[in-house]
Amino acid sequence: MKILIELPTWLGDTVMVTPAMDNIISHYNKPEITIIGSFVSIEVIKNHPKVVKAEVLKKNYISLYKIAKNLGQFDVYFSFRSSFRSRIFKLLISSKNKYQFERNKYQNCHQVEKYNHYINDCLKTDFKAGKLNIKPSLNSSFNYSDPVVGINPGSSYGEAKRWYPEEYAEVCAKLSLQYNIVIFGGPGEEDIAVDIEKSLIEKGILNYQNLSGKTSISELVNQISNLDLFITGDSGPMHIAASFQVPTVALFGPTRDDETSQWMNPKSIIVKKNLDCQPCMKRACPLKHHDCMNLIKAADVLKAVQSLN
């Protein structure tokens, strides 16, 4: 059974699609999975044992046409995207059966469940959404020699989801006697990582490593999977940590924790302030005070860490 799956664009969404993808695989006899999507999404899923081919989609329509024709014939096609470009690609692809995710159809539940409901609707099944399932690189033997806390201060969604570097530094200073510190971040998030690094140096904290902007997706997965503790905002790396059930403190401000919190991680705790203006779902605070993150203090996060231990 030849199956083509178009993955979501973003890192976190791609991790959250894995329970639905596993249900697709379990439904069909001898599935051969080809995945298409953004570079980030492909890097997350390419190590899955059922994936036989992976193709990065380019943005221009000529490339879409060429890729669709070069991929050949499939028995079934599932798209986990609902964009106009994805709808065009659906028309171009050769498949006996084609299904497209409808973002507005599935509401008031976790994103993992939205993707899973979509697959149940397509297949006329009643699968439950299982655990997140991403695989470390087969070539990796990475391990930390000492207990390590990872912090992930950045966010691709916008500045409204970001907590403050001085607060992260205060948390790291308190935890530095128990843990070595690793600062994570993607391209464009190096600024906040450098601010945290400067604060740590000023506090005399030297047992840290700043990896912001320096890791591939595979390296990020391998390194997060081996952490002893993770402190993060609502982000893609947060979902990687959930996949490996890393003890996690997740800070939520403008986004909906009931939809995008860690899935099935019993070692996770959410820190948020439950303000009337939450969740606004804005990239920048429309009220100009950013209290949803500004009112979270280092003491709140340290208390959450203690509750995990």
Spans of model-derived segments:
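Catalytic machinery of carbohydrate-active enzymes
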Residues: 1-309
